């Protein structure tokens, strides 16, 4: 049994790149096609209690039917999600499946009374008004205040630079820096 476990584990690791992803709607049946056979295909579900579980002889928690090559999943539920690995006992042929169980999306016809009431609400709809002085958003006030502060800082920096330049360079006569401060 240990050699069979190691054979399956090594085969799965090498075959991980060749898996087929299958999405099965909840409650449907689906047949996983096994590899070409020389004797009989053994199917295992990975991630079970013993890391893998040979599933053709089991009845719980999943119900399946097996023939010599294929595995049919019956009345699929969320328990069926996982990795399925089918391999031929006497050759190196295998198939690897990732089964995902999906919920069917059903469309529901809308209620006609609700549609009529929605039509009435469209008739009474009014367009939004422009913001007045009472409805100015706080973000707009913050942006205007930030711009005013930055402009004041730039003006203060320019004045300080002009005063410092005149103090340290008294002999230079720059037309822009003729301030009598």
Curated annotation (Swiss-Prot):
Q: Can the keyword Glycoprotein be found in this entry's annotation?
A: yes
Per the UniProt annotation, where are the glycans attached? 29, 57, 70, 75
Keywords noted in UniProt: Early protein, Glycoprotein
State the Pfam families in the record.
Adeno_E3_CR1 (PF02440), Adeno_E3_CR2 (PF02439)
Q: Which domain of life is it from?
A: Viruses
Q: What does this protein do?
A: E3 proteins seem to be dispensable for virus growth in tissue culture cells. They are potentially important for virus growth under special conditions; E3 region may help adenoviruses to evade the immune surveillance of the host.
Q: Which family does it belong to?
A: Belongs to the adenoviridae E3_20 family.
| Protein name as catalogued | Early E3 20.3 kDa glycoprotein
Source organism phylogeny: Viruses, Varidnaviria, Bamfordvirae, Preplasmiviricota, Tectiliviricetes
